[in-house]
Design a protein with these regions (language model features):
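Extracellular, repeat-based ectodomains that mediate carbohydrate processing or recognition
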Residues: 1-245
Length: 245
């Protein structure tokens, strides 16, 4: 990941027999600097598809990882630490969602926002453990200040694909979030929503692939933006024809 000055940061997870460690390094003009540890734990959910990430800008850094919360295979929480540059120290770890339900929470995207805040978007499975019948995976987002305090939080979509990555980018007019939706007919196409003047737009399909699949393909979209230009890439396989759109 890079900050607005073009400095490149790399984060990764290493494991031994006892614990997992999240660390990062910054690329200097000569080499990668000495790795620095963000957090360690012996109860993390470590997975190839849903993994920790680092967000960096001039005001500091934010890092997240996934921590097992109960006995279910996919019962895990999103944990995060914040590094305000003016304090030059990591905050205590906190859980970014406040539902308190042991369910799947993950597939996070993080984006530097206004005045040192961070926009964090994630898949939230609280409704899959509640209601009769049980609900669906939801898409939620929140704004967090430099200390990690929650400033705002929203449900962006009440029914989305269960385990596809989310992605976000900052445009000239504000943030855009893209993700894989899930209709009642099991059509799982890519949708987008934008935060404009404090309100999220109604999610809309980027393209009507009409890919109907009764299961999660574990393959979300990726978005990038520069000024008013936005580019999104994603995988689709309607009629068993795989392609990148």
């Amino acid at each position: 990941v890079a900050n607005e000055s073009g400095e490149i940061y790399l984060s990764w997870v290493s494991q031994d027999t006892e614990q997992a460690t999240l660390a990062f390094s910054r690329l200097t003009s000569e080499d990668w600097d000495t790795p620095k540890v963000i957090s360690r734990g012996n109860n993390w959910f470590v997975n190839w598809a849903d993994f920790p990430a680092l967000s960096v800008d001039a005001s500091g850094m934010v890092a997240h990882w996934l921590q097992i919360s109960a006995q279910g295979t996919y019962d895990y929480d999103i944990r995060a630490r914040f590094y305000p540059k003016d304090n030059a120290t990591w905050t205590a770890a906190r859980t970014i969602h406040t539902d308190g339900i042991s369910a799947e929470h993950g597939f996070v995207s993080m984006l530097p926002f206004d005045n040192g805040t961070t926009l964090i978007t994630w898949l939230d499975g609280r409704e899959t453990k509640q209601g009769n019948p049980l609900g669906a995976m939801t898409l939620r987002a929140g704004i967090f200040d430099k200390s990690g305090a929650n400033v705002s939080e929203w449900e962006l979509d009440h029914r989305v694909c269960d385990c596809c990555q989310t992605s976000s980018a900052m445009t000239e007019k504000g943030p855009i979030v893209v993700y894989r939706d899930r209709s009642s007919e099991e059509v799982r196409d890519i949708y987008a929503t934008r935060l404009i003047e404090g309100a999220w737009t109604l999610p809309q399909p980027l393209h009507n692939d009409n890919w109907q699949i009764a299961g999660c393909p574990v393959n979300g979209p990726s978005v990038a933006a520069m000024n008013e230009r936005v580019a999104v890439a994603w995988f689709s396989a309607k009629d068993d024809t795989p392609k990148i759109q």
